Amino acid sequence: GLLYGNGDAVIGINPATDNVAQSIRLMQMLDEVIHKYDIPTQSCVLTHVTNTREAIEAGAPVDLVFQSIGGTEATNTSFGFGLSDLAETRDAALALERGTVGNNVMYFETGQGSSLSAGAHHGLDQQTCEARAYGVARHFDPLLVNTVVGFIGPEYLYDGKEIIRAGLEDHFCGKLLGVPMGCDVCYTNHAEADQNDM
Protein backbone atom coordinates (compact mmCIF):
# COMPACT_ATOMS: atom_id res chain seq x y z
CA GLY A 1 0.00 0.00 0.00
CA LEU A 2 2.80 2.47 0.75
CA LEU A 3 4.06 2.13 -2.83
CA TYR A 4 0.78 3.69 -4.01
CA GLY A 5 0.68 6.36 -1.31
CA ASN A 6 -1.99 4.49 0.65
CA GLY A 7 -2.00 4.57 4.41
CA ASP A 8 -1.57 8.28 5.00
CA ALA A 9 -3.90 8.29 8.04
CA VAL A 10 -2.83 4.89 9.28
CA ILE A 11 -0.65 2.04 8.07
CA GLY A 12 -2.54 -1.12 8.89
CA ILE A 13 -1.69 -4.79 8.68
CA ASN A 14 -4.15 -7.65 8.96
CA PRO A 15 -2.06 -10.34 10.65
CA ALA A 16 -4.46 -13.15 9.64
CA THR A 17 -3.69 -14.80 12.98
CA ASP A 18 -4.73 -14.44 16.61
CA ASN A 19 -1.16 -15.01 17.78
CA VAL A 20 -0.37 -12.13 20.16
CA ALA A 21 3.41 -12.54 19.85
CA GLN A 22 3.18 -12.25 16.06
CA SER A 23 0.98 -9.17 16.37
CA ILE A 24 3.55 -7.59 18.70
CA ARG A 25 6.33 -8.28 16.16
CA LEU A 26 4.26 -6.55 13.47
CA MET A 27 3.58 -3.58 15.76
CA GLN A 28 7.30 -3.24 16.48
CA MET A 29 8.21 -3.51 12.79
CA LEU A 30 5.70 -0.81 11.81
CA ASP A 31 6.90 1.42 14.63
CA GLU A 32 10.51 1.04 13.43
CA VAL A 33 9.59 1.91 9.83
CA ILE A 34 7.55 4.95 10.88
CA HIS A 35 10.37 6.28 13.07
CA LYS A 36 13.23 5.41 10.72
CA TYR A 37 11.66 7.33 7.83
CA ASP A 38 9.97 9.95 10.02
CA ILE A 39 6.56 9.22 8.48
CA PRO A 40 3.80 11.43 9.91
CA THR A 41 1.34 8.59 10.44
CA GLN A 42 0.39 5.90 12.89
CA SER A 43 0.05 2.15 12.75
CA CYS A 44 -2.58 -0.44 13.50
CA VAL A 45 -2.40 -4.22 13.54
CA LEU A 46 -5.90 -5.49 12.88
CA THR A 47 -6.05 -8.05 15.65
CA HIS A 48 -8.81 -8.67 18.18
CA VAL A 49 -9.26 -5.98 20.83
CA THR A 50 -8.36 -8.41 23.62
CA ASN A 51 -5.12 -9.30 21.81
CA THR A 52 -4.27 -5.62 21.54
CA ARG A 53 -4.83 -5.19 25.27
CA GLU A 54 -2.42 -8.09 25.89
CA ALA A 55 0.08 -6.46 23.54
CA ILE A 56 -0.15 -3.16 25.42
CA GLU A 57 0.39 -4.98 28.71
CA ALA A 58 3.50 -6.57 27.16
CA GLY A 59 4.88 -3.13 26.23
CA ALA A 60 4.03 -3.12 22.51
CA PRO A 61 3.96 0.21 20.64
CA VAL A 62 0.21 0.48 19.96
CA ASP A 63 -1.03 3.58 18.13
CA LEU A 64 -4.55 2.44 17.24
CA VAL A 65 -6.80 -0.26 18.66
CA PHE A 66 -8.76 -2.24 16.06
CA GLN A 67 -12.04 -4.10 16.30
CA SER A 68 -14.85 -5.16 14.00
CA ILE A 69 -18.10 -4.01 15.59
CA GLY A 70 -21.81 -4.57 15.12
CA GLY A 71 -25.01 -2.82 16.08
CA THR A 72 -26.33 -5.25 18.68
CA GLU A 73 -24.87 -6.68 21.85
CA ALA A 74 -25.39 -10.18 20.46
CA THR A 75 -23.40 -9.32 17.32
CA ASN A 76 -20.49 -8.04 19.36
CA THR A 77 -20.67 -11.07 21.64
CA SER A 78 -20.39 -13.24 18.52
CA PHE A 79 -17.25 -11.24 17.69
CA GLY A 80 -15.89 -12.16 21.12
CA PHE A 81 -16.02 -8.86 23.00
CA GLY A 82 -18.22 -6.51 24.99
CA LEU A 83 -18.26 -2.74 25.24
CA SER A 84 -16.23 -2.96 28.45
CA ASP A 85 -13.41 -4.58 26.44
CA LEU A 86 -13.41 -1.60 24.06
CA ALA A 87 -13.41 0.86 26.97
CA GLU A 88 -10.60 -0.87 28.87
CA THR A 89 -8.39 -1.22 25.80
CA ARG A 90 -9.06 2.37 24.73
CA ASP A 91 -8.03 3.57 28.19
CA ALA A 92 -4.86 1.46 27.99
CA ALA A 93 -4.01 2.93 24.57
CA LEU A 94 -4.65 6.48 25.77
CA ALA A 95 -2.33 5.86 28.72
CA LEU A 96 0.51 5.18 26.26
CA GLU A 97 0.25 8.81 25.07
CA ARG A 98 1.60 7.94 21.62
CA GLY A 99 -0.63 10.32 19.67
CA THR A 100 0.69 13.68 18.56
CA VAL A 101 -2.69 15.30 17.92
CA GLY A 102 -5.93 14.35 19.65
CA ASN A 103 -7.00 11.26 21.52
CA ASN A 104 -8.46 9.20 18.68
CA VAL A 105 -6.96 5.77 19.36
CA MET A 106 -9.69 3.50 17.93
CA TYR A 107 -10.15 2.06 14.44
CA PHE A 108 -13.39 0.18 13.74
CA GLU A 109 -14.63 -1.85 10.81
CA THR A 110 -18.32 -2.45 10.20
CA GLY A 111 -20.62 -3.44 7.37
CA GLN A 112 -24.23 -4.35 6.74
CA GLY A 113 -25.10 -7.99 7.18
CA SER A 114 -22.90 -8.95 10.13
CA SER A 115 -25.82 -8.96 12.58
CA LEU A 116 -27.89 -11.05 10.17
CA SER A 117 -25.11 -13.57 9.56
CA ALA A 118 -24.61 -13.91 13.33
CA GLY A 119 -28.34 -14.42 13.89
CA ALA A 120 -28.14 -11.36 16.14
CA HIS A 121 -30.36 -8.81 14.37
CA HIS A 122 -33.49 -9.25 16.54
CA GLY A 123 -35.71 -8.72 13.48
CA LEU A 124 -34.10 -5.42 12.51
CA ASP A 125 -33.03 -4.70 8.94
CA GLN A 126 -29.36 -4.55 7.93
CA GLN A 127 -29.17 -0.76 7.69
CA THR A 128 -30.72 -0.19 11.12
CA CYS A 129 -28.23 -2.59 12.69
CA GLU A 130 -25.44 -0.81 10.85
CA ALA A 131 -26.57 2.62 12.07
CA ARG A 132 -26.51 1.27 15.62
CA ALA A 133 -22.90 0.14 15.06
CA TYR A 134 -22.01 3.76 14.27
CA GLY A 135 -23.54 4.75 17.61
CA VAL A 136 -21.19 2.29 19.30
CA ALA A 137 -18.25 3.66 17.33
CA ARG A 138 -19.07 7.30 18.04
CA HIS A 139 -19.04 6.66 21.79
CA PHE A 140 -15.34 5.70 21.60
CA ASP A 141 -14.22 8.76 19.58
CA PRO A 142 -12.47 6.81 16.80
CA LEU A 143 -9.89 8.02 14.32
CA LEU A 144 -11.61 6.04 11.59
CA VAL A 145 -14.62 3.82 10.97
CA ASN A 146 -14.47 1.80 7.77
CA THR A 147 -17.33 -0.12 6.21
CA VAL A 148 -16.13 -3.37 4.65
CA VAL A 149 -19.63 -4.29 3.55
CA GLY A 150 -18.46 -6.13 0.42
CA PHE A 151 -16.92 -8.86 2.57
CA ILE A 152 -20.35 -10.09 3.74
CA GLY A 153 -20.89 -12.16 0.61
CA PRO A 154 -23.82 -12.95 -1.67
CA GLU A 155 -25.91 -14.48 1.10
CA TYR A 156 -26.71 -10.90 2.16
CA LEU A 157 -25.62 -8.73 -0.79
CA TYR A 158 -26.00 -10.64 -4.02
CA ASP A 159 -24.13 -8.62 -6.63
CA GLY A 160 -22.05 -5.55 -7.40
CA LYS A 161 -25.08 -3.25 -7.48
CA GLU A 162 -26.19 -4.32 -4.03
CA ILE A 163 -22.64 -4.01 -2.65
CA ILE A 164 -22.25 -0.50 -4.09
CA ARG A 165 -25.67 0.54 -2.76
CA ALA A 166 -24.84 -0.80 0.71
CA GLY A 167 -21.43 0.89 0.70
CA LEU A 168 -23.01 4.24 -0.18
CA GLU A 169 -25.71 3.75 2.47
CA ASP A 170 -23.09 2.94 5.07
CA HIS A 171 -20.87 5.86 4.11
CA PHE A 172 -23.62 8.47 4.16
CA CYS A 173 -25.24 7.06 7.29
CA GLY A 174 -21.90 7.19 9.10
CA LYS A 175 -21.34 10.78 7.99
CA LEU A 176 -24.85 11.77 9.14
CA LEU A 177 -24.17 10.23 12.53
CA GLY A 178 -20.91 12.15 12.85
CA VAL A 179 -18.31 9.40 12.65
CA PRO A 180 -15.12 9.70 10.56
CA MET A 181 -16.35 7.28 7.92
CA GLY A 182 -14.50 5.46 5.18
CA CYS A 183 -15.54 2.79 2.71
CA ASP A 184 -13.32 -0.12 1.73
CA VAL A 185 -13.78 -1.19 -1.88
CA CYS A 186 -14.14 -4.94 -1.45
CA TYR A 187 -16.15 -7.97 -2.51
CA THR A 188 -15.99 -11.72 -2.10
CA ASN A 189 -15.02 -13.86 -5.06
CA HIS A 190 -18.23 -15.89 -4.87
CA ALA A 191 -20.44 -12.77 -5.21
CA GLU A 192 -21.77 -11.72 -8.61
CA ALA A 193 -19.25 -8.88 -8.72
CA ASP A 194 -15.84 -8.09 -10.11
CA GLN A 195 -13.29 -5.28 -10.05
CA ASN A 196 -15.16 -3.39 -12.78
CA ASP A 197 -18.17 -3.09 -10.46
CA MET A 198 -16.08 -1.52 -7.76
Map each language-model feature to its residues:
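Anaerobic metallocofactor- and corrinoid-dependent redox/one-carbon enzyme cores
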Residues: 2-3, 8-198
